[in-house]
């Protein structure tokens, strides 16, 4: 038995709020943290490997896993199915390692309602303002004005569900937000349910106490 059970760390935010950067920093801070590998029904792209970028499944295989309750969360996006297989996540957290999820609020709810939900830690990242959110999207130089407008419209749908999350951070300073994020993760790792070895330790203390009498 490991001293610690891993967490399911869920990071969500509207596009441009800094979630991806914070996720990279979190994984740099703790190289043992694993990023969740999703399953998908889309075809592999050149250079992609099964089990590394994605678990590539047929539609029948994917739907079968959903029916059997083997997906923590799943969604249909642009004609393909995507989801988080429960098996690899369960194995990872039982080995004492955390798993990081980049999902939206709907994925957060599904994970929270799964049998692993009691080990979930969900964090929502807010921008300091809508004006700053647009500025960040435009400064990337990656998207057309039309795509940016679509992302801005979707951002309110994401932001409006902030109340589903355990913690909400306003990312007005990236370094400060990173430190707050690490503080949250460090504290949540110490939750009683995340320390399976505690029960045996308490039994040992009880036995020692009884030997005194």
UniProtKB/Swiss-Prot annotation:
SUPFAM superfamilies: P-loop containing nucleoside triphosphate hydrolases. GO terms for molecular function: ATP binding; guanylate kinase activity. ATP binds at residues 13-20. SMART domains: GuKc. It comes from the Bacteria. It is an enzyme of class 2 (transferase). Residues 6-186 form the Guanylate kinase-like domain. Its EC number is 2.7.4.8. GO terms for cellular component: cytosol. It is found in: Cytoplasm. Pfam families: Guanylate_kin. Its main location: cytoplasm. It catalyses: GMP + ATP = GDP + ADP. The keyword Magnesium does not apply. Keywords: ATP-binding, Cytoplasm, Kinase, Nucleotide-binding, Transferase. Belongs to the guanylate kinase family. Essential for recycling GMP and indirectly, cGMP. This is Guanylate kinase. The gene is gmk.
């Amino acid at each position: 038995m490991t001293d610690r059970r891993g967490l399911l760390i869920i990071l969500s935010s509207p596009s441009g709020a800094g979630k991806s950067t914070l996720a990279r920093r979190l994984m740099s801070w703790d190289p043992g943290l694993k990023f969740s590998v999703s399953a998908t029904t889309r075809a592999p792209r050149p250079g992609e490997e099964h089990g590394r970028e994605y678990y590539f499944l047929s539609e029948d295989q994917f739907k079968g896993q959903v029916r059997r309750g083997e997906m923590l969360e799943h969604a249909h996006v642009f004609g393909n199915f995507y989801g988080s297989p429960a098996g690899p996540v369960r194995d990872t957290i039982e080995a004492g390692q955390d798993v990081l999820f980049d999902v939206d609020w709907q994925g957060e709810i599904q994970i929270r309602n799964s049998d692993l939900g009691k080990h979930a830690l969900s964090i929502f990242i807010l921008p300091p303002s809508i004006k700053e959110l647009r500025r960040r999207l435009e400064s990337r130089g990656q998207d057309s004005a039309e795509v940016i407008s679509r992302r801005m419209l979707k951002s309110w749908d994401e932001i409006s569900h902030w109340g589903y999350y355990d913690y909400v951070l306003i990312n007005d300073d990236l370094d400060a937000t990173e430190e707050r994020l690490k503080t949250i993760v460090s504290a949540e790792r110490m939750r009683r349910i995340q320390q399976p070895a505690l029960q045996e330790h308490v039994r040992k203390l009880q036995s020692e106490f009884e030997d005194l009498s």
